[in-house]
C-alpha cells in the first residue's frame, strides 16, 4: 500500500512524463503499418491461441453488454463468462487466453460506445442499443514491450510462447527513429493481421513533389484516361466465382457446417476482389 506522499510523487512523475511525450509528439506524425501474420508458419499452439483469443473476446464482449452494472464492472471478475453454444443454450466457460489488459480495454470500449450513443440521443438522433457480436474482429494491444513488441521480422504477443512471423516489415525500412506504440490484432474472417501504430519524426519523412500537371478524363469504356495517354480500368465487379458461390448459398441449411464453409469461401473471394481494387488505387495514387 502506497503512502500519500508516494502517491503524490508517482502522480507528479506521470504528469512530467506525459508532458515530455506530448512535446515530442508535436514534432512527429502518426502512421499505422499493417502486417499480415504468416499463418502457415504458426505452430499448433499458436494457431489455437490466436483463434481462442478472438473467441473469448467475443464471449466477454457479449457478456458485458448484457450486464446492468457495466460502469462499475471489475475486469478481475471476468474469469468466467456465460455465453451461448451453437444450439442457443447458456453455458459457462473459463477465460484462459484473454489477458487483463484486453479485459480492461473491452470494458472501456463498451463504456465509450454507450456514452457515444447517449450523446447522439441527447442531440435528437434515434439510437438503439449495443448488439451482440457473432464474430470479433479487432483486439487492442495497448502497451508496447508488454502486450506486444517487434523483433526483427517477427512479433512477440503477450501470452503466445514463441515469436510470430509477419509479412510486410519492409514498410519500415525507409524510416528512422520510429517510436512504436499501440497495436491492433485484426481478423477479417480468413487472415490475421497486426496493425502497429508508430510515431515518426517529421524531419525523417521525405516529401516528394511532382510538378507535372496531368489532365484526367473519366470515360465509359475506360474508367480513367490521363492526358499523357495512360489508361486505367478501375471497374471491378463481382467475379464469376463469387456469383456461383452466392447461388449455392441459398440451398445450404442455416447452421450447417457446409454453409459455414461456403460463407468462408465467399468471404475469401470478397477479400480477393477488394485486394484488386486497393492495388489499382495504389497504382493510380503513386503513378
Placement of each model-derived feature along the sequence:
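Nucleic-acid substrate recognition interfaces
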Residues: 1-287
Amino acid at each position: 500500500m502506497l503512502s500519500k506522499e508516494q502517491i503524490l510523487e508517482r502522480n507528479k512523475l506521470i504528469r512530467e512524463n506525459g508532458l515530455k511525450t506530448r512535446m515530442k509528439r508535436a514534432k512527429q506524425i502518426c502512421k499505422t503499418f499493417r502486417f499480415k501474420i504468416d499463418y502457415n508458419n504458426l505452430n499448433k499452439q499458436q494457431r489455437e491461441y490466436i483463434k481462442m483469443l478472438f473467441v473469448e473476446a467475443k464471449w466477454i464482449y457479449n457478456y458485458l453488454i448484457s450486464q446492468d452494472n457495466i460502469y462499475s464492472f471489475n475486469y478481475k471478475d471476468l474469469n468466467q463468462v456465460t455465453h451461448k453454444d451453437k444450439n442457443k443454450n447458456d453455458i459457462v466457460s473459463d477465460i484462459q487466453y484473454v489477458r487483463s489488459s484486453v479485459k480492461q480495454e473491452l470494458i472501456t470500449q463498451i463504456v465509450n460506445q454507450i456514452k457515444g450513443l447517449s450523446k447522439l440521443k441527447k442531440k435528437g438522433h434515434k439510437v438503439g442499443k449495443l448488439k451482440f457480436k457473432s464474430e470479433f474482429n479487432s483486439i487492442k494491444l495497448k502497451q508496447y514491450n508488454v502486450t506486444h513488441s517487434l523483433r526483427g521480422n517477427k512479433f512477440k504477443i503477450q501470452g503466445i510462447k514463441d515469436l510470430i512471423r509477419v509479412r510486410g516489415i519492409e514498410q519500415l525500412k525507409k524510416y528512422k527513429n520510429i517510436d512504436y506504440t499501440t497495436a491492433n490484432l485484426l481478423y477479417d474472417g480468413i487472415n490475421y493481421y497486426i496493425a502497429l501504430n508508430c510515431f515518426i519524426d517529421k524531419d525523417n519523412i521525405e516529401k516528394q513533389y511532382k510538378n507535372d500537371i496531368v489532365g484526367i478524363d473519366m470515360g465509359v469504356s475506360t474508367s480513367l484516361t490521363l492526358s499523357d495517354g495512360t489508361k486505367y480500368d478501375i471497374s471491378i465487379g463481382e467475379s464469376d466465382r463469387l456469383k456461383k458461390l452466392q447461388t449455392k448459398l441459398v440451398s445450404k441449411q442455416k447452421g450447417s457446417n457446409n454453409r459455414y464453409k461456403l460463407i468462408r469461401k465467399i468471404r475469401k473471394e470478397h477479400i480477393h476482389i477488394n485486394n484488386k481494387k486497393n492495388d489499382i488505387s495504389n497504382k493510380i495514387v503513386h503513378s
